[in-house]
Amino acid sequence: MPRLLGWNGARIQGRVRELLNIFQLDPGAYAAKFPHQLSGGQQQRVGVARAFAAEPAVLLMDEPFGALDPIIRAKAQDDLRDIQRRFGTTIVLVTHDIDEAFRLGDRVAVMSQGRVLQYDRPAALLICPSDPFISRLTGTGDRAMKLLSLTTAGEAAEAGPAEGATVPASATLRDVLSDLLWSGAAVVTVIDAAGTPCGRLTLAGILAHGRPR
């Protein structure tokens, strides 16, 4: 695509190196490799990198992670989210996995039989579904856990003294709750990317985030 847009060789090579570095693939080791020489996860990262090669303003992705195992899939989803935030690209992603839609989407459009039933933020789809189909799709048995997965520890951190184990600010409240239940603790300290405490979370505070407001 960059060649079709008239990019010169130097610009193309620079973009290739930039994207490989962003996706944690050393250009010296991977730039000349063929797809069959890469692992499944590496192939997926290269595929996403190629989609960003021409600096598109809007990117359409149809079930991009459906064939990956859960661990590689989660990493690929995290990579896509980080890259989207870095470049500011608008991504329209089609998926049949509501958890994936909630994990990646700022807004989610739920469609059935060719009609858009609701277009809203993930939390609104959980708390105020406009149609019985959406209620069935989002599930009723684990709504609280889905709601907790939409908020990070950094977003929910409360002021207070550092106490207990530490959790990264990027962790979801669902993950933090799981850790607290497993350890039997009632409070954890939230740390930023540099390892600096930026607040704390209590079990009671997390549970409050799992209820509609």
Located regions from the model:
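Conserved catalytic motifs of ABC-family nucleotide-binding domains
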Residues: 55
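Catalytic Walker B motif of ABC-type/P-loop ATPase nucleotide-binding domains
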Residues: 59-62
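The conserved cystathionine-beta-synthase
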Residues: 162-194, 202-213
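Hydrophobic anchor residue at the start of the ABC signature
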Residues: 48
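ABC ATPase "signature
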Residues: 119-120, 128, 200
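Conserved ABC ATPase "signature" region
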Residues: 10-29
